[in-house]
Amino acid sequence: MLNDEALVERWLGPGGPELQAEVIRRLRAGERLDGLALDRIDGRWDLRGLGAPEPRAAEPDSTTRQSGGMSFTFEFSDVAATLEFQRARLVDLDLRGAHLPRLRLFGCVIDNSLFDGAHCVGLRMWATDVSDTSFLAADLARSSVGGWYAGRGNRLRKVDFRHADLSRLGCGVASFTDVDFAHAQLECTNFWQASLVRCRFAGVLREVVFDGRVLEPERDLGPNPMQDVDMRGVTAFDDVDFRGVSFDRVTLPDHPALVVVRGVARVEAGLQRLADRDDHAAQEARGRLQHLRKFMGVAGGADQALIDMRTLIDPEAALLLRVLLT
């Protein structure tokens, strides 16, 4: 089993800490792992259960502020990265069940590796390529794969994030190709200026933003398409926002409550028809149309939007919107 005590114990028993330190040193230095007391599993070096040492936080600083006649004291401290890799090649590694919190990757390559069930909370990467790698059921909460460094973003190709914890994941300006997000926890995740090509989503999407607009033209990012994206397995769009996204090559669930709106003119016409109405259904419908209008056809985005009628509180508002938009 991935979390079996034996996987961790071998790094803690006689010679284990020294072996672990040497493995990490070689990986950081770009040296091969040949000659170490390591086995291979399906062609990958067996590093299952590897645990990077936890850094100690600096002594907390404190500051006191006055507000409204009351005094508030805040304490804060910096937590260092657990491991930092510069231009390293992490290739053919089996790191299932590893403990690697707050990993930092600059200009690295990860290829043909397994991080299934690994604890990688707070991962950060810049100008890094990840390919043919699995993070199945890994804990990547509060991580970021959206850093901009050395004039480029991160590129992820053929990566498996199924059932992974990706909550509060930073994805800005990253490129995702053939990536599987099925049943991953994506709460509070923003695909900001991210490219999604041949990707799959399934399960509940909650508080996710897909932003296809070009918001930083000075970076020459090019288009941020959603192409051949499979969302047929999504069971709920809970507070999910699509901004400037084209649905021409997005496969949505076959559900009558999902309505793709094409053209801001249709939204404008709907708002005009609601101008003289003040009932509850009209108010909710108007608010939804005003929100859609903000992100349609502006800043390089597509002139399309998506409404999930199930998310409206008033059933009459859903009926009204359907009449106005279809």
Regions found by a protein language model. Give the residues of each.
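N-terminal capping/linker segments that flank leucine-rich repeat
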Residues: M1-P53, G263-T326
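Tandem repeat scaffolds
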Residues: G13, P17-R266
